[in-house]
């Protein structure tokens, strides 16, 4: 059993029919719930073993209010100070009682993955998601205000009716919610899914073998998909890494919108032939400052200061980085 101390456990407490896009009722009989007594026994085992993370794979964990509350109360009351629990939820379904309970959680006890997918209402309707975006935003703001829960927000490129302009709006909408992680994914047309049935109607062309990822649609060309892949890489490097938390917001403010900065940064990497997959963090700082020099040379003194601040905030650097100003008097 010692192996559990170094493993992520994937766990399921409920199962939803593949045909159900979003569970709207806590008494929806298409959702099968596991016995809560058994669930609590199993969770206690993981807690006793000090598992670093238990990742719930329930498709919409909080579609049943009572079920979600019982589990959240249990992990809050039996917190071992080590184990983290990851849940995929629909934030617009959260009510006041759930939000109040989440606010009491130890920082780091819970992280939430919220599948926004798109903020285009026509797109959401086409994929049978009935998300109340205003409620979703309100819930995310409320969760953020407590500073105790790590929030992931997910977008999916390649959905029906989402052209480049629409996707850019969705990206900027989600970015404005300031998640700790912004996951930019690409549609996967799974066998037997609704979108497989509708692929021809929507002009969705996808890979013929796993992961069956979208190649292009009526609304997004193959070139658009490649462009978004590059933007995804920049978001991973410079936003989701949480290594540039002071420099990126200031630099981004010089652009029309967040997407515009990441899009242009992706072009910069591509045109210069710079490596995206490099373990050297100093390299990423250096490239970002070169980009800043190209886009806003008048702001370079501030950008260098912020880069050094971000670096020393996270690194035990033994020497000053090459991009640091000379502090000799």
Report residues per predicted region.
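Glutamate identity and glutamate-enriched acidic tracts
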Residues: 12, 41-42, 70, 77, ...
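Radical SAM [4Fe-4S] cluster-binding motif and immediate context
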Residues: 1-145
């Amino acid at each position: 059993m010692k192996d559990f101390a170094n493993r992520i456990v994937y766990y399921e407490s409920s199962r939803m029919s593949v045909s159900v896009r979003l569970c709207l009722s806590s008494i929806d009989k298409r959702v099968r719930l596991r016995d809560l007594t058994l669930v609590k026994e199993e969770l206690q085992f993981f807690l006793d073993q000090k598992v670093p993370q238990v990742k719930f794979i329930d498709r919409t964990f909080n579609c049943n209010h009572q079920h979600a509350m019982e589990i959240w109360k249990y992990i809050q009351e039996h917190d071992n100070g080590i184990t983290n629990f990851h849940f995929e939820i629909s934030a617009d379904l959260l009510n006041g009682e759930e939000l109040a309970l989440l606010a009491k959680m130890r920082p780091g006890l819970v992280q939430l993955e919220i599948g926004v997918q798109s903020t285009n209402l026509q797109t959401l309707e086409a994929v049978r998601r009935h998300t109340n975006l205003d409620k979703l935003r309100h819930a995310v703001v409320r969760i953020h205000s407590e500073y105790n829960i790590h929030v992931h927000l997910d977008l999916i490129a390649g959905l029906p009716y989402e052209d480049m302009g629409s996707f850019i709006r969705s990206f900027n909408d989600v970015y404005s919610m300031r998640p700790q992680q912004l996951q930019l994914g690409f549609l996967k047309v799974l066998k037997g899914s609704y979108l497989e049935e509708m692929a021809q109607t929507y002009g969705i062309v996808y890979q013929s073998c796993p992961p069956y990822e979208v190649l292009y649609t009526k609304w997004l060309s193959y070139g658009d998909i490649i462009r978004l892949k590059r933007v995804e890489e920049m978001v991973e490097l410079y936003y989701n890494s949480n290594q540039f938390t002071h420099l990126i917001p200031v630099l981004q403010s010089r652009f029309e919108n967040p997407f515009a900065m990441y899009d242009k940064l992706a072009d910069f990497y591509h045109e210069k032939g710079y490596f995206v997959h490099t373990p050297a963090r100093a390299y990423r700082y250096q490239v970002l400052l070169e980009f800043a020099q190209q886009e806003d040379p008048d702001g370079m003194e501030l950008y260098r200061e912020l880069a050094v601040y971000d670096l020393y905030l996270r690194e035990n650097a033994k020497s000053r980085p090459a991009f640091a100003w000379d502090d000799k008097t």
